[in-house]
Amino acid sequence: MRARAVMVCGTTSGAGKSFLATALARWYSRQGLRVAPFKAQNMSNNARVVAGGEMGSAQYFQALAARCVPDVRMNPILLKPESETRSQVILLGQRRDELSAMQWRARAEHLWPTVHGCLEELLAENDALIIEGAGSPAEINLQATDLVNMRVAEAAAAATLIVCDIDRGGAFAHLFGTHQLLSLKHRALIHGFVLNKFRGDRDLLAPGPEMLKALTGVPTLAVLPMWREHGLPEEDGVFDAGPAFGSGLSVAVLAYPHISNLDEFAPLRQEPGLSLCWAREPRSIAAVDLLVLPGSKNVAADLAWLRQRGLDAAVMAHVSADKPTLAICGGLQMLGSEVQDPLGVEGAARGLGLLPYSTEFQPAKRYRHGRHSLAPLSGFWAALSGIGFDAYEIRHGETRAEPHPSARSLRAVADDHCGWQYGQTLALYLHGMLESPAVMRAVRRQHPDARRHSERSRGFHRPALRGGCIDVVARLRMARHDKSMTQIDQLRPTTVTILKSLIPGDRPWTSSPRHPPLMRDAPAAAMPSVLREPPAPGPQSPTSLARFPTTRS
């Protein structure tokens, strides 16, 4: 039996599509259904390594929420911006240069059969498919070449939600305008509106939802409260909402324009005893305890950006003073003497010359995911010695030590040329180390003031990988214990309302085993460690979803 599909579209980027799709994926999974996420095309430099290559982080985490093994078919097209006008195209997990060079309108039609094929396969293999759109479905200049919004909803016969960020203002205009700019056949797929990030008295919304329904025929199914600390990785932008420097360990992450895999730094914002800023000016890193150079999708361009802003001198002063520094992937490459690119993969550049090694880009991209631990470390990083953590590599660069006297102080700390320590600088090709609770505790404890913070302080808000699974609904239910967030518990009952209103029809859902076969039958090595445990029992049996109402409202 073909899966029932639910699609989450938004009026804008950042409306809450990824968050709501994750919540729906978990809720359906808790009913014992076999669930998978899908997003036809994602534009993001945040990616995770899976079998077959890489996929967007948002769909990776949605797969974990659905308790299924992440699969490149869940995000068949990933566009990784390299400049203002060019993106690297990842198709089914692998880089495809010929597609990157293709004119985008022609590329869209060329790729639709792949998108449609992945969609049909996932619909055939699952009971429920949670589909996420991109940006807005009402971009009338893009509708003719749509790969990711209403064309997908139509192909999947998906009951579609439109979610809007009410905190930005103009929510009803956004929803009405989006609805009106859709074709009549696509309007018929819209089953409800969702107002997200609401603060204040819900009674103040009246009679807005009723008037909107009178204009469009579409009900507002839910009003979801503002909740910044949900712990799920952000897909777009930098975490500028993080706390200002206060007590505890101060951390600055360089926010260069082509930063990649920034979602791995979410724990720095969530961890008690740490204070985080995203550094774009030299003064931002002048007095920090720990400086982080993250990954980059365009190392040459981001090195030029550092020099233009005077940040190169600030980084050199920090590292030369032997203050703690963490460099990951592209950041590691920046600290060396040079980046060579004989085949024109990304671009050559002169490095900062702070560590005695150089990097050469290779034509083949390296993908690897596994369990790692670092060799004995010293100084600030000593507490990390021997701690096991899950990590992944996505890179073209190969880095080797140079025949220089200072290279004797460069110590390999990870296998296969994946990491080095040089004084107080730790340089790694391994993404994801900071997502380990044990690693974060070890880092936090390096500052005397941080030891005052209780292990349980703000523990509920820690990143979504912690606690064994991503369970948005359970998180929202637990939030009632936080007096500052008393409205959060609204989401669970309103989520149930959404779910029971979405899918019309007379036939019952096909119930899968409590352990969905996609996860259960996979080899343990293929699964992230968070999936190697039984899922929590659902709050109600699958049969409670046997019949849905035949009308939207």
Q: Predicted regions span which residues?
A:
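Flexible phosphate-sensing "switch/lid" loops adjacent to ATP/NTP-binding sites
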Residues: 1-317, 324, 363, 378-453, ...
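A conserved active-site-flanking secondary-structure segment within enzyme catalytic domains
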Residues: 336-391
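Short Gly/Ser/Thr- and charged-rich N-terminal loops/segments
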Residues: 477-480, 513, 535
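Low-complexity, intrinsically disordered or signal/transmembrane-proximal segments
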Residues: 481, 487-490, 515, 540
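Compositionally biased, intrinsically disordered low-complexity segments enriched in Pro/Arg/Gln/His
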Residues: 532-539
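Short, intrinsically disordered C-terminal tails of secreted or membrane-associated proteins
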Residues: 545-552
